[in-house]
Amino acid sequence: MLFALTIAFYQVPKIQADLSENYEEIRIHNTKVEARLKDWIHRAKSHAQALETSNHKTIARWRKQMQHIQFKNEAEELQRLNSIINDDVVYRDDYTHFHKKDFWADPETTLEEGGDCEDIALLKAASLIRLKWPHNRMHLLVGYLTERGKAESHAVLLVENRKGEQFILRSITNDVVRPGHFKFTPIYAVDGEGTIIVKPPKKN
């Protein structure tokens, strides 16, 4: 019954969507990347209760802010959530933080201690799931940022709205943009279903 109600909730009237700016996607499998995401999901679930009960000031503020933005329209939820997390979470690179080259921290750790671009993007995904966004509309997108004069490894959260239009939640700025609207070369995305080779949208 609950499953049926959930499906019904997401059955909205068809609205003309602009998919021309979406990334092109080719579904593949990368066992290493998918294992890392599976491990992150396991750790995130094990820390879920702490997010609801912790008195840490950043986590308590995050809970309160999530309540304030829930049930707003999709565009407003994305913009508010992106600004909240970017403003609250301190950037810390993995080598300084964990003494590892690359590590995906769980949401509790990221809120309490800060994190790098992957950690921040994954925290945004966990926050959207808390706001009842379906997990299959979110992807961790990895590539190279080129807007600062050189290619830098970077990751962001790629989200699809109910019409199937893709949006990127930036972390260097608070902007929520369509693919191709900032200088970023995508390589791959990963979600609960596997890995996706991502290509920039075709130009008309």
What are these regions, as identified by a protein language model?
Residues 1-6:
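Bacterial N-terminal signal peptides
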Residues 9-204:
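A structural boundary/capping signal
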